[in-house]
Amino acid sequence: MFATISALRDISRRCLAAEPLTPEQSQLLAVSLTRFIQRDCPSLEAALGLRFPRGGVPWWREEAIRKRNAALRDLAAQFCDGHAVSAQAHRIWLLTSRYAASTWRFDRERTAMPDAYAGTEKQYVWIAFRSGAPMPVCERHLRTILGR
């Protein structure tokens, strides 16, 4: 599924840049659109093979959660290394809660991270919030994320 998403992103990039598609990309689009138009599939997602189990997490949310969790793990590795997972979770919960209450309301409109955040804790916090996954995360859930 993630290979298909990657291929679709490349197709999108090529279309926006007015670059020609590869034969494989053209084939993927043609077959998928034909399946959708002929009503062989109930949605474009199904036609493209982007399926998730009934009641499961949609692919776009799963991707956002993976990005968020990676940013939170990187934050812990860079700035909380050597501390117990519970201490890391508490520190990150404080950072993200404060950020949510103060700065995120301004930063959410930005498409690029502020330069001042580079190399700081806020860099990883901004990435986690920008991922699109629910934030801030409670301490208990942070312990689960950081424990992996």
Question: Where are the regions a protein language model picked out?
Answer:
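Low-complexity, PEST-like segments
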Residues: M1-R110, D115-Y124, R130-G147
